[in-house]
Amino acid sequence: MATDAAELFKEALSLFPGGVNSPVRAMKHLPTPLIVKRAEGAFLYTIDGVKLIDYCMGFGPLILGHRHPTVLEAVRRSLEDGWLYGALTRNEVELAKEINSSIRSVEMIRFVNTGTEAVMNAVRLARGFTGRRYIVKFEGNYHGAFDYVLVKAGSGAATWGVPTSAGILEDAVKYTLVVPYNDVEALERVFREHGSEIALLLVEPIAGNYGLIIPDLEFIKATRELTERYGALLLFDEVITGFRVGLNGAQGLFGIKPDLTTLGKIIGGGFPIGAFGGRRDVMSMITPQGPVYNAGTFNAHPVSVAAGLATIRVIKSGGVYEVANEAAERITEAILDSASRSGFDIVVKRIASMFQFYFKKGDVKTPADVRASDEKLYLTFHREALSRGVYFTPSQYEVNFTSAAHSRDVVDETIRVIEEVFKALKTKAH
């Protein structure tokens, strides 16, 4: 059996494509990717015994921190009762009620296993409900790894779907239209040209899969106004933002009520889950009540539901957002201050307990702005911070997250490391 990270990764390379089971974990700028043995609170512990302050937090689900005792106890109780029934359970009803009481647009809900599944079924549902073919998505918005939405924008204001991945048939994306994010004029144009044929507009109300891009209010309001005008459905993909930016999600922050919402991450408390929900008349089309098919052996898995229910109830008990948001605020202020004192151009974006930073001048409002950032310098920053015990997200195209476990002492240590890293970067630059 492999005894250290290098040996284990060598074995992994022979077993998994690229040595990992999700591409972002590859961390190709490091000699070996991060290999974790255990976690507690705000900390990860690697297979080589290194303790790290974690700002990835499982890429978002762990808003309470690792191994929160209430969630751990809920999972233990669930496992003691049994772990799969193929039947309705009390906890899934209770979790649905907790979601509905916070995200009021979700009048009915269907639990699935991933965010990808949630969006995939929501697209089918929208087409079934409207009888239309086209869907519209935005450049840089990620809605899961399935063919209809795994497309990017080409040149011009709007483009026919262009597959992002090998293996996707052009026919699979010929009814997917892609529009630049934060561009109201382009969105208006695509609705003028195709509005009567559009079934669904999908949007990340806060883009969290191309770094962190916060929308202009005019833009996000236009998504609702145009879909209502042309009779299309509006889907807010809140897999990341649901229960992260507040109890009411991003739709609560912006005061917009979408027709459909997709959720994941936090509603599973760190266990696999996804959900799509929305207007009662739309959701009533789902089997067995209606003709739009969805099924799954592991839908509303008892352990995932137990963890999610415990997580949301802890959030609702108070204090979680205050700690997590303050931690993110202090860290982003420290990054801005240290970068300025060291002579680096930097753009820092934060909303609630989500943040990301970019080595560039100007602002970041579109995916093109993210691409224009100095990715090499970000990776150098990441490597330097990691060597000092702080694990920021390993790509400028991802997002950092804080949690209720990021206490003032943890943040103090993080700020000390940030200051050290910028001093080291300044020395290397000269």
Swiss-Prot record:
Hydrolase keyword on record: no
Chemical reaction(s) catalysed: (S)-4-amino-5-oxopentanoate = 5-aminolevulinate
Keywords noted in UniProt: Cytoplasm, Isomerase, Porphyrin biosynthesis, Pyridoxal phosphate
Pathway(s) the chain acts in: Porphyrin-containing compound metabolism; protoporphyrin-IX biosynthesis; 5-aminolevulinate from L-glutamyl-tRNA(Glu): step 2/2
Cofactor: pyridoxal 5'-phosphate
GO-annotated cellular components: cytoplasm
InterPro entries documented for this protein: 4pyrrol_synth_GluAld_NH2Trfase (IPR004639), Aminotrans_3 (IPR005814), Aminotrans_3_PPA_site (IPR049704), PyrdxlP-dep_Trfase (IPR015424), PyrdxlP-dep_Trfase_major (IPR015421), PyrdxlP-dep_Trfase_small (IPR015422)
GO molecular function, one term: glutamate-1-semialdehyde 2,1-aminomutase activity
Transmembrane segments: none
HAMAP family with a match to the protein in the record: HemL_aminotrans_3
Family under the similarity heading: Belongs to the class-III pyridoxal-phosphate-dependent aminotransferase family. HemL subfamily.
Official protein name in the record: Glutamate-1-semialdehyde 2,1-aminomutase
Protein source organism: Caldivirga maquilingensis (strain ATCC 700844 / DSM 13496 / JCM 10307 / IC-167)
Origin organism lineage: Archaea, Thermoproteota, Thermoprotei, Thermoproteales, Thermoproteaceae
Gene behind the chain: hemL
